[in-house]
Every structure is written in C-alpha cells, then in structure tokens.
Amino acid sequence: MTAPASTQAATLKRFISAWEKWDAQEWISTFSDDFQQVTLPHSLSVPVRTRKEVEIVLPALVATVKSYQLQIHHVIHDPDNNKAVVYAASTGKLPWGDWNLEYAAFLTFTDDGGKVARLEEMLDTAFLQDFGPKFGKYLEENGGPVAVAAGGKQDLRSEA
C-alpha cells in the first residue's frame, strides 16, 4: 500500500529544503531508521551506507563544503510507486578547490510516506573519482569525520 501523495510530497519538500539549506541534521531527520544510501553507478564500488554511517559522514561533508549552493533542475514525484527523483547541481568551495557536482537522486519513501527509506544517488563520476580520495585524506588529516563535523558548526553556507 502506498502512502497518500500529500504525505510523500511533504516529505519530499522537507528533504529538498534540508538539502538546499545544507543542514546535515535536518536532512538526516528525513531518513527512516532503516535508511540506506546507495551511490551510483555501481561500477564505483561504493558500499551501501546505513543511516548510522550517513549520520557520521554527512555532517563531515557539510562541514567541508563551504558556500554551498544547490540548483534543482527537475523534480518528479511518483506517488503510486512511493518514489521521487530529483535532478540537481551544486557548487561550493572545498579546502583544496571547487565543488561542482551533478546529481540524480532517486528517493523511495517509507510505506507511510513520512520518511525517506532509500536514497540512490547517481553522481558525476569524474568529479567523484577526484573528490573521494581527497576527502578521505582531508578527514584523516583532520581527526576523522566526527572531528571535521564538530569543527564545522559555523554558518556552513558562507566562506569560513
């Protein structure tokens, strides 16, 4: 049974709003307890992340990318199948250069429509192949994701 379209639409709106604000905690609050994040394409061999793993990595990412701006290009909501798709691009500043990433985010809602149960993200592989190792090194050099996130409590949308 699918959730009412209005419930899914409200969840989708909260998800996009948190993403636009670049607010990790608000974004995570839209995820179900059994949430899964899948990075696509599968050829990148990025393991599926659980909510607990995302709760560690996402705040560190948000703290690392400054002056974040998101541009939503398309949103498609398919309430009959409990799904939505968002095509977006974002820009920002990293400690080592620019952040320029395109996304196609495929969301699956919980049965009641109140949370996002699964997020499958098709990412710009050229950017990701460069970013991934540099982000890993940055986290390692700065005490890990929890330490990076803790140091990023200032206004994350402006230059620090």
Swiss-Prot record:
Pfam families: SnoaL_2 (PF12680). The keyword Oxidoreductase applies. Pathway: Secondary metabolite biosynthesis. It is an enzyme of class 1 (oxidoreductase). Monooxygenase; part of the gene cluster that mediates the biosynthesis of the tetrahydroxanthone dimer secalonic acid D. The pathway begins with the synthesis of atrochrysone thioester by the polyketide synthase AacuL. The atrochrysone carboxyl ACP thioesterase AacuM then breaks the thioester bond and releases the atrochrysone carboxylic acid from AacuL. Atrochrysone carboxylic acid is decarboxylated by the decarboxylase AacuI, and oxidized by the anthrone oxygenase AacuG to yield emodin. Emodin is then reduced to emodin hydroquinone by a yet unidentified oxidoreductase. Belongs to the avfA family. This is Monooxygenase AacuO. It comes from Aspergillus aculeatus (strain ATCC 16872 / CBS 172.66 / WB 5094).
